[in-house]
Design a protein with these regions (language model features):
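A broad, low-specificity signal marking well-ordered, structured residues that form hydrophobic/aromatic
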Residues: 21, 33-34, 51-53, 154, ...
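Middle-to-C-terminal accessory/interaction subdomains
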Residues: 82-150, 154-290
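A conserved helix-loop-beta module that forms one wall/lid of the active-site cleft
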Residues: 1-28
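An acidic- and aromatic-residue-enriched active-site/binding cleft used to recognize and process polar
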Residues: 20-28, 35-41, 159-161, 171-175, ...
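Short loop/turn segments at connectors of secondary-structure elements within structured domains
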Residues: 17-19, 30, 150, 163
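Internal "kinase-insert"/substrate-recognition segments embedded within catalytic cores
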Residues: 11-16, 28-138
């Protein structure tokens, strides 16, 4: 919920709308869930109906997928797992279209890692919508989402006559979760060396653009704690009922018995206070490290 609120403050083409809901199944109340718009190529969602939508995901859940090198991913020494979310064969994808999409991704990757990558006309800026890549990175960085380095639910899209654009954001089940176990989360930047950003940050102009955009967005980002307070009050009764139905401490240890998030055995209000504190600390940490 917080991640999508942050995303909506940026220039990303589209951020899914979401709403906390009470779910009733067969007449039985089963708790509080987040209802969210699905990602799809659509004039009202991801504007790439005449282009393509890519998903980078090491789970390899897409019908069409490949490893593109160079690129930085925790799962392998070199390469990024790409998949085509749209179009698929049911949408009319042909062998020629598939070859063209893969060739385009290869061209972009080589431009990012090429000797002339800083060149405005032949480097990464020729192919990437740089502002979207900056805003996308900022959302991941604020929410401590490591999935840029371990690609899962990382989306890119391109319209027929546009550049390769970052977004939309999605998932964030690992957002804030790693704060207790990641020194980077508590002291620095978690996605400085992830994905293509490992190369982009080698360009002083890109770094300067990130810092400038950060300072531009910071006043809006500082309003999120008030939004957290508002949602805490709105969901108070719902959360109390939800905690009785689903004890977070019982299924929180899917990671070999380790409490990875740090709030599994906290009360609702204590967990919210922790979330707000971490968020405020991240704003300070990022400001110091850019």
């Amino acid at each position: 919920l917080i991640a999508y609120k942050v995303g909506s403050m940026t220039s990303l083409d589209w951020t899914p709308h979401c709403q906390s809901v009470e779910l009733v199944m067969n007449g039985k109340h089963v708790g509080n869930y987040l209802l969210i718009e699905q990602i799809r190529a659509d004039s009202n969602r991801v504007p790439c109906e005449d282009g393509f939508l890519l998903e980078c995901d090491f789970h390899y859940d897409n019908e069409i997928q490949w490893i593109q090198t160079p690129g930085k991913c925790i799962q392998m020494q070199n390469g990024i797992p790409f998949g085509i979310k749209y179009p698929d064969y049911d949408d009319g994808l042909t062998g020629l279209m598939l070859s063209e999409i893969k060739e385009y991704v290869r061209t972009v990757s080589e431009a990012v890692y090429g000797d002339n990558f800083k060149d405005s006309y032949e480097g990464y800026a020729k192919y990437l919508d740089v502002k979207s890549f900056i805003d996308y990175w900022i959302v991941f960085e604020v929410m401590i989402n490591h999935e840029l380095g371990n690609p899962g639910s990382v989306f890119l899209h391109k319209s027929a006559d546009g550049k390769l654009t970052a977004g939309p954001i999605w998932d964030f089940d690992w957002g804030v979760l790693s704060y207790n176990v990641s020194p980077q989360a508590r002291n620095g930047l978690v996605n400085r060396d992830s994905f293509w950003y490992a190369r982009l940050f080698d360009d002083s102009d890109f770094k300067a653009a990130v810092k400038s955009r950060w300072n531009e967005l910071l006043p809006q980002l500082k309003t999120i704690p008030a939004f957290i307070d508002e949602m805490e009050k709105t969901l108070q009764t719902s959360a109390e009922l939800n905690f009785r139905m689903w004890d977070p401490s019982e299924d929180a240890s899917q990671n070999g018995g380790v409490i990875v998030n740090g709030d599994e055995r906290m009360s609702y209000n204590a967990a919210v206070a922790r979330l707000k504190k971490i968020y405020e600390e991240r704003l300070e940490i990022i400001s110091k490290n850019l």
